[in-house]
């Protein structure tokens, strides 16, 4: 996979792309990153990339020309049609399901804006997706783009080294992850649940399902709305609700 970032602040990406999972993914050849300062594509003699909004108003608006030229140049060098993603608080909320969808693409181009906003023609004629990482406003799109790149990259084959890790993460199953424990079995009097020490894999699996459902019900009940539960999951959920009513 190729992931390109179009930004006015390329230095923001240095630490993120050269650390942890993203660094390992590049070393394993699973992904390549490219950070491009789209100011370099500006035809303005002063390399301006923004201008005042027509009709008046506060702030500056990103001009279409530099971003169109940058995307078109990156697309020329691509063997497949890229997903061009605009980081924007008005966009679709980014979810694990969206990450899984994007992980199937060969090439992503993430547009990171600053200033008041984008010329509407960028939205209408250049991008394929508009994404937001939450209902709040950031100074620019760079942090959101980093979040998306991390979330997508860890889903690529061989990146985590243990495929089960990605499959059992919170949200990957549509539920929050069950509690995890490691040694020691007793820390300051706080003990690991006996079932996890039993070696009985069937009981452990059932406990994990129950805890995952319980945690989801308590913290993110919206994830259960409209979810098609298995017979075992429904039985466990009914039991959890009865216990909570006592």
Swiss-Prot record:
Reaction equations catalysed: guanosine(37) in tRNA + S-adenosyl-L-methionine = N(1)-methylguanosine(37) in tRNA + S-adenosyl-L-homocysteine + H(+)
Residue numbers binding S-adenosyl-L-methionine: 113, 133-138
Cellular compartments annotated: Cytoplasm
Ranges in coiled-coil conformation: none
GO-annotated molecular function: tRNA (guanine(37)-N1)-methyltransferase activity
Keywords per UniProt: Cytoplasm, Methyltransferase, S-adenosyl-L-methionine, Transferase, tRNA processing
Pfam families: tRNA_m1G_MT
GO terms (BP aspect): tRNA N1-guanine methylation
This enzyme's EC code(s): 2.1.1.228
Example of a GO cellular component annotation carried by this entry: cytosol
Family as reported in the entry's similarity comment: Belongs to the RNA methyltransferase TrmD family.
Known function: Specifically methylates guanosine-37 in various tRNAs.
Record-linked NCBIfam families: PRK00026.1, trmD
Record text on subunit structure and interactions: Homodimer.
Protein known as: tRNA (guanine-N(1)-)-methyltransferase
Species the sequence originates in: Halalkalibacterium halodurans (strain ATCC BAA-125 / DSM 18197 / FERM 7344 / JCM 9153 / C-125)
Organism classification: Bacteria, Bacillati, Bacillota, Bacilli, Bacillales
Name of the encoding gene: trmD
């Amino acid at each position: 996979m190729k992931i390109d970032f179009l930004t006015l602040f390329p230095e923001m990406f240095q630490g993120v792309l050269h650390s942890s999972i993203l660094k390992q993914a590049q070393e394993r050849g699973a992904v390549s990153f490219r950070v491009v300062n789209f100011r370099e594509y500006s035809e303005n003699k002063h390399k301006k990339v923004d201008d005042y909004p027509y009709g008046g108003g506060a702030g500056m608006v990103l001009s279409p020309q530099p971003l169109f030229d940058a995307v078109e140049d990156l697309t020329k060098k691509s063997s497949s049609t890229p997903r061009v993603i605009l980081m924007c608080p008005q966009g679709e909320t980014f979810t694990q399901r969206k990450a899984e969808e994007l992980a199937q693409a060969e090439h992503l181009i993430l547009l990171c804006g600053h200033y008041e906003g984008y010329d509407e023609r960028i939205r209408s004629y250049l991008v394929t997706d508009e994404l937001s990482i939450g209902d709040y406003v950031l100074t620019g799109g760079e942090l959101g783009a980093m979040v998306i790149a991390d979330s997508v990259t860890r889903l690529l084959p061989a990146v985590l080294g243990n495929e089960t890790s990605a499959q059992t993460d919170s949200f990957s199953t549509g539920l929050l992850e069950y509690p995890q424990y490691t040694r020691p079995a007793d820390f300051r009097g706080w003990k690991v649940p006996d079932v996890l020490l039993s070696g009985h894999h069937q009981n452990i699996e059932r406990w994990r399902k129950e805890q995952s459902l319980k945690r989801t019900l308590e913290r993110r009940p919206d994830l259960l709305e409209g979810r098609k539960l298995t017979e075992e999951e429904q039985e466990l959920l009914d039991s959890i609700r009865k216990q909570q009513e006592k």
